[in-house]
């Protein structure tokens, strides 16, 4: 979990990315990302202006040189222009290369800090804060939307700034040669650099606003398709899901096509304005030459300078589209950064207790963000060292919410939660999770070896310790029978293992971590009844003497625990030993009767 430790906020500090409400606009917050790197961006702007200025200077000087050379003056008279032409030609390439190097290096460093900030925010939000978020959409925000932020700098702000500088210089130089030509160039550059982008921006606005969300939808469809191919095939739903992915792709293609139409419109209008401006300046130049106010050599400069000047504004229509695109991507990124945290880390954490015992919940209530009803209410629970408690109830009773509160994945909104007499909310989340561990029903197995999956729990564990954990999880005989033993690959999400083997490997990992308190959240879920009951019995045997909270909706094996707590709609409706509760009228007995009837039906 991110956010713990003194360096947790360093990426946010470097990038200027902060969570929470902000008085800045979305694009204002993107600009704030520059932070201490504004000097390097100013250097990139200067280099970009010099590159464009060199292009204009090259065209103007070349025009003057060719026109003057046609008069066959002494060669030495042309040497300054020849040298300037060479300097502008070399400078154009050198300044452009330097501008790209400085701007991209600076912007990519900002993106790296931003991506780290987003990832750390996701760590703080997970798992309770991401309950309604799709994985594909999260991936799109973390990768594509963060990447899109670079376009604000390298395809909008820096090009627009360089275009403004070079346009002003070109207009000033042309007006110095011929005022009316300078005025015509000013009108043309204003039309191409501001008017055309406004038109194309209006045309593309709706498409650009929909582009990032549509990209997220496609990513979600593809992620679901790739991760659930086997299940979709078995259920016969693969064609429908494939069609949904194709439809999302077609929608994204149509949106991109509309944006491309606006780009083409902008290119065409810019070329038209450029041609008209050059024609007008040529007309004014011809009149000035006829009137004797302008030399024929200067006439070439008056005509060619506007032609080169339009290179500065040629990309402005596309730049405006990128600005619109960045705005929507930035909104999606800041939706993550501004999302309320389900857990608040203490500003000044308390010292960790020597022992977490007794672990005590008193009058505890918890609610997920956006819900109007408590998922847990008025819950009391005390765990002494070695005590084992089973929490049972139907789906939605609040069992998993209890697990999340115990691990501080979700903070209680009422009541108290203490570890060894210390308020858990005054401890860092990582400290709580060193005392309380989880073996979840959907524990993730990485696409690596059995050994590497176990070493996640304790990096320096010896071979003997790994084998001991596997033995306690009743998995050692299976591992010893594998050709590669501990180095056997498990496959993605443990695909090469059976359901029971995956759960046992997850249990072995939790046992290896040696948590003082171990929470087993529906460890036998998704298994057939005989396998589930056998696994539950083995889990209880493996945790003998360890403080354990077993969360389950199955009752098999619960006579081995010290207390059974029955939840319904987030409240405790019955508690006591299994032997006491199963013989009296109440929710547990009703559950036992339904379970027995289900087993009889299954055998039949």
Residue map of PLM features:
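Helix-loop-helix
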Residues: 63-84, 173-187, 262-331
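C-terminal portion of ABC ATPase nucleotide-binding domains
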Residues: 1-20, 24-28, 537, 545, ...
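ABC ATPase nucleotide-binding domain helical subdomain, centered on the C-loop/LSGGQ "ABC signature"
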Residues: 416, 451-491, 537, 545, ...
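ABC transporter TMD-NBD coupling linker
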Residues: 306-370, 411-414, 418, 461-469, ...
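Helix-to-loop junction immediately C-terminal to a conserved catalytic motif
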Residues: 407
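Transmembrane helices of ABC transporter permease
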Residues: 44-50, 158-210, 283-294, 311
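Short cytosolic helices in intracellular loops of multi-pass membrane proteins
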Residues: 108-128, 135-139, 143, 209-251, ...
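An intracellular "coupling" helix at the cytosolic face of ABC transporter transmembrane type-1 domains
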Residues: 30-39, 127, 131, 144-153, ...
């Amino acid at each position: 979990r991110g956010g713990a430790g003194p360096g947790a906020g360093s990426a946010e500090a470097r990038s200027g990315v902060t969570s929470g409400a902000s008085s800045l606009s979305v694009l204002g917050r993107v600009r704030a990302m520059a932070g201490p790197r504004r000097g390097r961006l100013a250097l990139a702007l200067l280099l970009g202006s010099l590159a464009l200025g060199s292009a204009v200077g090259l065209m103007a000087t070349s025009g003057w040189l060719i026109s003057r050379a046609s008069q066959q003056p002494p060669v030495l008279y042309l040497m300054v222009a020849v040298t300037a032409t060479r300097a502008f030609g070399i400078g154009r390439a050198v300044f452009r290369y330097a501008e790209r190097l400085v701007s991209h290096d600076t912007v990519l460093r900002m993106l790296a800090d931003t991506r780290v900030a987003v990832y750390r925010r996701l760590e703080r939000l997970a798992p309770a804060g991401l309950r309604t978020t799709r994985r594909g959409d999260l991936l799109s925000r973390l990768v594509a939307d963060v990447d899109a932020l670079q376009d604000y700098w390298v395809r909008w702000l820096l090009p627009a700034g360089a275009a403004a500088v070079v346009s002003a210089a070109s207009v000033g130089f042309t007006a110095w040669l011929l005022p009316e030509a300078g005025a015509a160039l000013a009108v043309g550059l204003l039309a191409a650099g501001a008017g055309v982008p406004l038109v194309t921006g209006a045309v593309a606005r709706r498409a650009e606003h929909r582009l990032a969300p549509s990209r997220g939808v496609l990513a979600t469809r593809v992620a679901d398709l790739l991760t659930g191919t086997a299940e979709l095939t078995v259920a016969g739903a693969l064609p429908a899901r494939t069609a949904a992915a194709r439809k999302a792709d077609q929608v994204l293609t149509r949106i991109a096509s509309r944006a491309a139409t606006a780009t083409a419109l902008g290119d065409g209008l810019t070329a038209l304005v450029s041609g008209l401006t050059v024609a007008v300046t040529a007309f004014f130049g011809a009149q000035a030459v006829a009137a004797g106010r302008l030399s024929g050599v200067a006439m070439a400069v008056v005509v060619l300078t506007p032609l080169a000047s339009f290179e500065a504004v040629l990309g402005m229509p596309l730049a405006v589209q990128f600005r619109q695109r960045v705005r929507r991507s930035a909104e999606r990124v800041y939706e993550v950064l501004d999302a309320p945290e389900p857990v608040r880390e203490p500003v000044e954490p308390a010292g960790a207790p020597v022992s977490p015992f007794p672990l005590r919940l008193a009058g505890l209530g918890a609610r997920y963000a956006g819900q109007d009803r408590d998922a847990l209410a008025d819950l009391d629970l005390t765990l002494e060292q070695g005590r084992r408690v089973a929490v049972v109830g139907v789906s939605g009773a609040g069992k998993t919410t209890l697990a999340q509160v115990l691990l501080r994945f979700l903070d209680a909104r009422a009541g108290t939660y203490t570890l060894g007499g210390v308020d858990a909310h005054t401890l860092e989340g990582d400290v709580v999770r060193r005392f309380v561990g989880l073996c979840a029903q959907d524990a993730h197995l990485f696409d690596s070896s059995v050994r590497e999956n176990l070493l996640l729990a304790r990096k320096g564990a010896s071979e003997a310790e790994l084998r001991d954990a596997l033995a306690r999880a009743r998995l050692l005989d299976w591992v010893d029978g594998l050709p590669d033993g501990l180095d056997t690959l498990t496959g993605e999400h443990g695909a090469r293992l059976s359901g029971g083997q995956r759960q046992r490997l997850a249990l072995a990992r939790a046992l290896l971590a040696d948590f003082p308190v171990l929470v087993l959240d529906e460890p036998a879920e998704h298994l057939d009844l005989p396998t589930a009951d056998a696994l539950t019995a083995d889990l209880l045997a493996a945790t003998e003497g360890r403080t354990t909270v077993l969360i389950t909706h199955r009752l098999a094996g619960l006579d081995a625990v010290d207390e059974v707590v029955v939840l319904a709609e987030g409240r405790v409706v019955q508690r006591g030993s299994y032997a006491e509760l199963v013989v009296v009228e109440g929710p547990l007995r009703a559950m036992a009767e339904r379970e027995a009837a289900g087993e009889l039906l299954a055998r039949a």
